[in-house]
């Protein structure tokens, strides 16, 4: 029982500190064309977006906003919510 509670707390903790949304463009992406459409929608709405050319097929990193997450769900685009530490690690991996 304690193990289950610890797992739940870790998962909740990771979500609580999440500040970035990652749209992967590798084989895990369910719809590449619609993912580009989400990126274009984000740009049209004057929101920040980073194109990670050398990471997972040219993934996109965006701020974790409910509007963007909803747009991904509506369009059927795969996405991941990542924490600040993960975002920094990804950016440093690309730079090296």
Where are these regions (language model features)?
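Sec-dependent N-terminal signal peptides
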Residues: 3-13
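Non-catalytic, low-structured ubiquitin/UBL-interacting segments
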Residues: 16
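Intrinsic-disorder/low-complexity accessory segments
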Residues: 19-96
């Amino acid at each position: 029982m304690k193990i289950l509670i610890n797992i739940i707390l870790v998962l909740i903790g990771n979500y609580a500190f999440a500040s970035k949304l990652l749209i992967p463009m590798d084989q895990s992406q369910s719809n590449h064309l619609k993912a580009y459409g989400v990126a274009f929608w984000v740009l049209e709405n004057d929101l920040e977006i980073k194109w990670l050319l050398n990471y997972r097929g040219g993934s996109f990193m965006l701020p974790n906003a409910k509007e963007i997450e909803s747009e991904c769900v509506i369009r059927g685009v795969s996405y991941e919510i990542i924490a600040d530490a993960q975002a920094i690690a990804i950016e440093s991996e690309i730079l090296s």
